[in-house]
Amino acid sequence: MDTRFHCVYLLTSLDPQCEGAHYIGYTVNPIRRLRQHNGELVNGARRTKRNGRPWLLLMCVSGFGEDRIALKFEWCWQNPSKSTRLKSHVSQLRCVHKLTHAVGVLLLLLRTELFSRLQLTLHIFDREHFDKVISQLLSALPTMEPLVETSLLRVESTTIEQFQTQYMNDGQWGAAVDYGAYFMRAPPGANVDVSKPIVGGQDNTLRCGVMHNNLCEEEVIRQHVKERTLLESGHYPCSLCSLPLRAPYFLRCSRTPFCRLRAHIVCLAMWFIYDSSQRGGDPLVKDAGPAEVAENSNDAACQVNENCYSLSGCGPVVGGIFNHDAYTDRRDDNSPPSPPCPLPTQSSQADASLAATSLPLVPRAPCDCPLCDEELQWSALVYDLKRRVAVEKRRAERERREAMDAEFAQRFQRLQSESNKKSTARERGALEGVRRKRRRRGEVAAKLTQQTAVRHEPTSGASGDRAHSAPPAPSCGGFDEIPANVTNPTAPLHADVLQVTEFNVDEWLNH
């Protein structure tokens, strides 16, 4: 849950040489950002530093629940020709330029389907300058529809001091309201005059405030992290029943973060119905006295309490909105427990039909916030809830994909390391085989060399001269030359052997 103040602002230059120059940006504190653009503080924009000073804060748009929506609004405002929501309508603004063109883009952007469903607020700081620009725009474009307030869009004229006091400073009640301590009206059925001012205040306007100006960014971030931790752990209480909320299935005020209203859907729906009944819009309380109003409101709350419990199965809700005693009395008569939604019993269906005929469960009329008296639109609250649920689902799906990708990468790395080990073992085995073959070939060559050397040695019975004489050198191309590839070579014949075995013809004839 983001508790920061997100807004998109429009600056215009007061320099006569830069008439019509403007700047569009996003910030969480437009007053401080204006001082940065004018050079009073550091970290200003480069574009506003070169020329155009001093700059005037003409307007800003607030009401964005998250920074992503505000940044998307800023980008569409800065790039209307590239935005899919404006590029088909921005052609009608060709005849206007500079500041008038920027204001015209804003009027078109506030009417788009995406941003028209949000409960936004347009803060105008210089009404005279704004009306002058609007008159120039409408005179140049007669077909352009003027800016009007709707049930979701609120336009207010303010000054920097009022804006600082109302949005940036602490509320009139001092520090931020702690969890569980709320300034609320009386619960349904209580005989209390709600027109009287609440205890601790002098009027019925703002009932709680949050600290922004007196806290640095680190403190705001720390508070945001604390609330998000409480939501994720299931310890953030509902503003109406004090039971824990389950993120993101809860409704919040459109003045977030200046209002800390966080409520269950059923609880806030009950508050809408109660507020409409107090205004006289419900037939149960029309033309009735104070006692009858209290009794009828209490009976209606009991009926919707039983119906909501039987349909949701979430248990009784305490804190003054639902009648816990009536529920306890109904549970003491040994009746079987009501099954959870979507399988209601016949009795719960009958109670639901009875409650539907007497009191609508889906609010239709706007209602004031029980904490800050801001006008709430049920459709805008439900749209914000659906958007947050969709964002949460996408975030969970993205985290799931990232976890799966990390697991697959880890498995692939493990398999790759195992295959590398096997390939290394195979390479080592092949290298060892090659070395073994080379070793065997060397041994065979050494044996052949030894045999050749032994056969070339002279016999022991030969004369000393022959024994000490050097062996004859082998003749090139003769029979004494031994080829290198002969495995069993024959020793050369000596002269003594030839003399003994030589055939003499004369001796043979004499015999």
From Swiss-Prot:
Alphabetic keyword roster: DNA damage, DNA recombination, DNA repair, Endonuclease, Hydrolase, Metal-binding, Nuclease, Nucleus, Zinc, Zinc-finger
Stretches the record annotates as Disordered: 325-349, 417-484
Annotated compartments: Nucleus
GO terms of biological process kind: DNA recombination; DNA repair
InterPro entries tied to this protein: GIY-YIG_endonuc (IPR000305), GIY-YIG_endonuc_sf (IPR035901), Slx1 (IPR027520), SLX1_endonuclease (IPR050381)
EC number per UniProt: 3.1.-.-
Predominant localisation class: nucleus
CDD domains hit by this protein: GIY-YIG_SLX1
GO terms for cellular component: Slx1-Slx4 complex
Required cofactor names: a divalent metal cation
UniProt keyword tRNA processing, yes or no: no
Gene3D superfamilies: GIY-YIG endonuclease (3.40.1440.10)
Molecular function in Gene Ontology: 5'-flap endonuclease activity; zinc ion binding
GIY-YIG domain: residues covered: 4-87
Compositional bias ranges of the Basic and acidic residues kind: 419-434
UniProt enzyme class: hydrolase
Zinc finger (SLX1-type): 238-372
Role according to the record: Catalytic subunit of a heterodimeric structure-specific endonuclease that resolves DNA secondary structures generated during DNA repair and recombination. Has endonuclease activity towards branched DNA substrates, introducing single-strand cuts in duplex DNA close to junctions with ss-DNA.
Family the UniProt entry places it in: Belongs to the SLX1 family.
Quaternary structure annotation from Swiss-Prot or TrEMBL: Forms a heterodimer with a member of the SLX4 family.
Name of protein: Structure-specific endonuclease subunit SLX1 homolog
Organism of derivation: Trypanosoma brucei brucei (strain 927/4 GUTat10.1)
